Amino acid sequence: MRSSALLLSTPVASASRRIVLFFSSGEREKKNHTCTSRTKLSIILIFVLAPIFSFSQDSLKTEFHKIGDSADYITNFSYHQTLTPQQKKKRIWLVAGGNVVAYGATMIGLYSAWYKNYPQTGFHSFNDWPEWKQVDKVGHFYSAYIESRASMELWRWTGIDRKKRIWIGGMSGAFYQTVIEVLDGFSAGWGWSWADFGANILGSGALVAQEFAWNDQRIKLKFSFHNKTYSDPALNQRSDVLFGETASERFIKDYNGQTYWASANLKSFFPKSNLPPWLSLSVGYGAEGLFGGTQNIAKDVNGNITFNRPDIKRYRQWYLAPDIDLSKIKTNSKGLKFFLTFLSAFKFPAPALEFSNGKFKAHAIYF
């Protein structure tokens, strides 16, 4: 797998022992994390462009539909315009053609810039499930969800049937990432990862299931990051090798600083309450002490140990924190609406309760 968060992929162990002959441990790690960065950046790009494309054409309105004789209400987003068949057809061709051209160009560029520079082999798979405390797998889950969310909004703009929009747009994230998984399967330096594939399907499935159940994303997947520095120079040096030296590289690659969240909008679940529509409660997952895929050790091409820190504990972290659903903030500004929608992919900084190593820890502000 290549890690994953944002087409996120994680650093991977090599698919066969002979790969060690081609790359030193540090080189493989850099290569795999480069893959991570290209995936994340591509997801961010898709998420940015999709709302721009749709919001630039139409404004959203909120329609309230009463359920039976009760006071329960559900919120459904639709467009002011009633599209003619010709308008729908034009938009469908525009979105479909844009997807094919943009994604095709991305894949060609990705192959030319990356895969063709490394040895190719027959299609093969490998098991990278034990690596990185599965933070990379959660990253795949998040990436597929965000891609699907962006794609679904594009298809919503076309005015196509609701079910078609949900299925076509909703499963786009899994499709986009699966193509890259296939390319990995033919690359000697990686391999097809069933764990990655499963996480991709589940991420897109989470969006599809919510749309069919609630016609809304009551539980949004989000991402946060805090930069990690250490008092031990050896750990900083190791982090430079694995995750890059700049803050932007660390943001994309450092699993020790990444947290993934499931943020539930409370008003959506309790419509009769007086809760503000933007208030959410989120559960987060992360890990620390990760200076290698499965253990904190690294070797060079000759098998010499270059980093060996079994004393550093590798552990999982769970979080509980309030959150703000920025997409629920009302505004008549298309630009601000887009900006808030984009930011809704990221966790809002807030107090948090952490559970790790069998203990609770409070954070005044966590991101």
Residue ranges of predicted features:
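Cleavable N-terminal export/targeting peptides
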Residues: 1-26, 33-80, 366-367
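N-terminal targeting leaders of membrane proteins
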Residues: 54-137, 141-148, 152-160, 274, ...
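Small-polar-interrupted transmembrane alpha-helices in polytopic inner-membrane proteins
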Residues: 102-106, 165-185, 201-204
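Alpha-helical transmembrane segments that form the membrane-embedded catalytic/substrate-binding core
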Residues: 140-147, 184-211, 319
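Outer-membrane beta-barrel proteins
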Residues: 153-159, 208-213, 264-273, 326-331
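Transmembrane beta-strands of outer-membrane beta-barrel proteins
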Residues: 172, 176, 219-221, 277-283, ...
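Residues on the lipid-exposed face of transmembrane beta-strands in outer-membrane beta-barrel proteins
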Residues: 205-209, 260-266, 320-326, 362-363
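Residues that define the transmembrane beta-barrel architecture of outer-membrane proteins
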Residues: 254-260, 277, 313-320
